[in-house]
Design a protein with these regions (language model features):
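Conserved, mostly hydrophobic/aromatic
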Residues: 81, 111, 128
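C-terminal helical cap(s) of enzyme catalytic domains, especially alpha/beta-barrels
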Residues: 99-122
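Residues that form generic nucleotide/phosphate-binding pockets
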Residues: 49, 114, 131
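Long, positively charged, glycine-interspersed low-complexity recognition regions
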Residues: 121-134
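Metallocofactor- and cofactor-centric catalytic cores in central/energy metabolism, strongly enriched
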Residues: 96
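Catalytic alpha/beta core domains of metabolic enzymes, predominantly
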Residues: 1-91
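Short secondary-structure transition/capping segments
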Residues: 2, 100-104, 135
Length: 135
């Protein structure tokens, strides 16, 4: 955020708010890891830091090492992030749970469905490029 505060963020810069689930980045069993847990309270903490920095860049969340995104706190975190104007980074590179093995498209559809549920439209490719200052 310091680059943004100094006006030196390149086009397309974003703020990625990382959350760490039960499986960390690649663990084969649940482990305690460093990082913010995937909760709405952690989201508010991150957003407070961003607000105090006075940096206004598009932001998104990514939940690393979590299982299904449509369960409990993970669902509420994604729903609240979308509702507050954030974006979601999803895909198999962040998903890890040895018992739950969705496809990449399944994870994308989960986020799409949450966005529709809160009334948030899905950006077209052109709209996304404009949003990130790449158009």
């Amino acid at each position: 955020m310091i680059f943004g505060k100094c006006g030196r963020s390149p086009k397309g810069s974003t703020i990625d708010l990382y959350f760490i689930g039960d499986y960390g980045l690649t663990a084969m069993q649940p482990v305690n890891t460093a990082g913010a847990p995937p909760t709405v309270e952690s989201l508010y903490y991150y957003l407070d830091i961003q607000e105090r920095s006075e940096v206004r860049l598009p932001w998104f969340i990514s939940v690393w090492g979590a299982g299904s995104q449509l369960e409990g706190e993970h669902y509420e975190l994604l729903r609240r992030a979308i509702d507050l104007g954030g974006h979601i980074k999803t895909g198999l590179e962040m998903h890890f749970d040895p018992q739950d093995k969705p496809g990449n498209l399944d994870l994308i559809w989960q986020v799409r469905d949450i966005a529709r549920d809160v009334g948030r439209p899905i950006a077209s490719q052109a709209e996304a490029r404009k949003l990130y200052g790449l158009a």
